[in-house]
Design a protein with these regions (language model features):
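N-terminal flexible segment immediately upstream of the FAD-binding catalytic core
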Residues: 1-68, 84-113, 260, 264-266, ...
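Short, surface-exposed ligand-recognition loops at beta-strand->loop->(often short) alpha-helix junctions
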Residues: 2-3, 227-235, 339-348
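Generic non-transmembrane alpha-helical segments
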Residues: 7-19, 65-73, 129, 238-246, ...
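C-terminal substrate-recognition/cap domain of FAD-linked oxidoreductases
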Residues: 31-34, 240-351
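Short, well-ordered beta-strand elements within core beta-sheets of diverse protein domains
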Residues: 53-58, 223-228, 278-279
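Short, ordered loop/turn segments at secondary-structure junctions
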Residues: 82-84, 142
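FAD-binding subdomain of flavoenzyme oxidoreductases
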Residues: 106-108, 119, 123-124, 128-247, ...
């Protein structure tokens, strides 16, 4: 096995160059991990797992040559975007080669309301470039400034924007994707429309995602609002109504019960101790209407900042989705989370 790995390393060096192969040290450890440690179960299972090497192909041809070499050597490969997932999808269970997609990051086109990009393109870059030409991403994770399109499609499901457009698997969001097969002579396979969802959330097990076309949404100028109430039920009633109001152009609706907001230290001066809060991204042309509607319901707006264009922090999205867990862990490392789903009768389910 060692001789085989040594031979493979030599071949991979000849393909990508010595500067784009990582064989040891902290860099290899980093490229072998994601945020799996959010889960105490995965932390125990995965903390000793790592790749034998990592490579950074800079073209589709280099990627094909790397995959072919690994296939011939019968060495497992694991694709990696930015490593911002929480479930260990990019952690190699059996050593082998991590393929880092960070150099395959081109935005190939932004035309007709469709982004055509390589798998390693960062969502933050796509969002910024799309907004320049009147568009924005339909949905993206809270890690959007760092995450890649390939990582989001293969390891994510939804996020900011899903309140309006649904998750990645909602009809029409994905136009097409191109996958590279893992075999001695790799092939490129194009899947279109609903067929492309066969590869959704499969972490590369169905092949390596090379290129993706995602439909975009018309650009909206947003305000970032935090709404507050000492009553969870009062806030929930208002937030639920806000979420259902189709005439309000929204990108985020997230409610937090106290003491969760106490973990958001950078926002402490805006938050009222004991209050539950709702974070809202809404069309700035509708902000006054939304704030007035909330006030009539007994809900106060305690934070109102525009989302700049191009987007620059601070972002209230940095406290939503799985970022919430990250802030909680900073306060108490023993905290983790469970996903729960609720139906239209969620109030009865709470009881």
């Amino acid at each position: 096995m060692e001789a085989s790995l040594d031979d493979l390393k030599s071949e991979l060096r000849s393909i990508v160059g010595a500067a784009d192969i990582v064989e040891s040290g902290e860099s290899l450890e980093t490229l072998s991990k994601d945020y799996y440690w959010y889960s105490p179960v995965l932390k125990r299972q995965l903390e000793e797992k790592r790749a034998d090497m990592a490579v950074r192909p800079g073209s589709v041809d280099q990627l094909s040559a790397v995959v072919a070499a690994c296939s011939r050597a019968r060495v497992p490969v694991v694709p990696r975007g930015a490593g911002t997932g929480n479930y260990g999808q990019c952690v190699p269970l059996y050593g082998g080669v991590v393929i880092d997609f960070s150099r395959l990051d081109k935005i190939l086109s932004l035309e007709g309301g469709v982004a055509r990009v390589q798998a390693g393109a960062r969502l933050g870059t796509i969002e910024s470039e799309a907004r320049k030409v009147g568009w924005e991403l339909r949905c993206m994770p809270s890690t959007w400034m760092k995450s890649t399109m390939g990582g989001f499609f293969c390891g994510g499901s939804g996020g900011i924007g899903s309140i309006t457009w649904g998750g990645i698997n909602a009809p029409g969001n994905v136009k097409s994707l191109t996958i590279m097969t893992c075999e001695d002579s790799p092939r490129l396979v194009r899947l279109e429309e609903a067929e492309s969802l066969k590869a959704l959330h499969t972490y590369g097990t169905t092949g390596l995602l090379v290129e993706i076309e995602m439909r975009l949404a018309p650009k909206v100028d947003y305000d970032q609002l935090i709404l507050s109430s000492p009553s969870w039920d009062t806030l929930l009633d208002w937030t639920h109504e806000a979420a259902k109001r189709l005439e309000w152009r929204k990108r985020l609706v997230t409610q937090f019960e106290w003491p969760i907001p106490s973990y958001f230290k950078p926002l402490a001066k805006y938050l009222r101790p004991g209050d539950s809060v709702t974070f809202l991204l809404v069309d700035k042309a509708q902000t006054a209407e939304v704030v007035a509607h909330a006030a009539k319901a007994g809900v106060a707006c305690v934070y109102n900042r525009p989302l700049t264009d191009p987007p620059k922090p601070p972002f209230i999205t940095d406290y939503t989705w799985n970022h919430t867990t990250l802030w909680a862990i900073k306060a108490d490392p023993t905290i983790t989370y469970l996903h729960s789903g609720f139906g239209p009768n969620f109030r009865q389910q709470f009881a």
